[in-house]
Swiss-Prot record:
Highest taxon above the source species: Bacteria
Recorded GO MF terms: metalloendopeptidase activity; RNA endonuclease activity; zinc ion binding
Protein name as it appears in the record: Endoribonuclease YbeY
Species annotation: Burkholderia ambifaria (strain ATCC BAA-244 / DSM 16087 / CCUG 44356 / LMG 19182 / AMMD) (Burkholderia cepacia (strain AMMD))
EC identifiers of the protein: 3.1.-.-
Cofactor(s) the record lists: Zn(2+)
PROSITE patterns assigned: UPF0054 (PS01306)
Gene3D superfamilies linked: Metalloproteases ('zincins'), catalytic domain
Gene Ontology terms describing biological process: rRNA processing
Pfam families: YbeY
Enzyme class of the recorded protein, top EC level: hydrolase
Amino acid sequence: MTLHVGAEPAPREEEIAEMADEPRELEFDLSVQYGDEVTGDVRKACPKRKLIAEWIEPALFSSAQLTVRFVGEEEGRTLNDGYRHKDYPTNVLTFAYDPLPDGTVIGDLVLCCPVVEKEAQEQGKPLAAHYAHLLVHGALHAQGYDHETSEEDAAEMEALEVAILAKLGFPNPYQ
């Protein structure tokens, strides 16, 4: 789920194709945070900064300043309730802000560790694959992609996720 705070619309397929042909000299500033509930084995199971960057970079179509925050159920529920009026924790929330004048994307990705772990187990996926998917998903949201506006937008976002994850060596998360 994305919460847009004046964020620009996402680049469309034609623009992405053009960008793919151009040399990419993107800057990526990544900050990683852990909520108070994320300790011990839960924190150890979270992907480390280098891996997070490796998974997000292929999903970036412009320079970005992103914060990835790993939280527990209480903080996840509080954020989801406060911003989406849904009183339960969700796997990932993306807060997208107005880009900088040079087009740099700014956003916060919040991942609720217990929810991510439970979903990975229920879906029979490696935890790393599920985290990679949600980080790519959140990074696309931060750039304006949205799967809730139309079926066409959802299909476009899903296709991008599948292609990016395949480049990273992960299977299609929707199968």
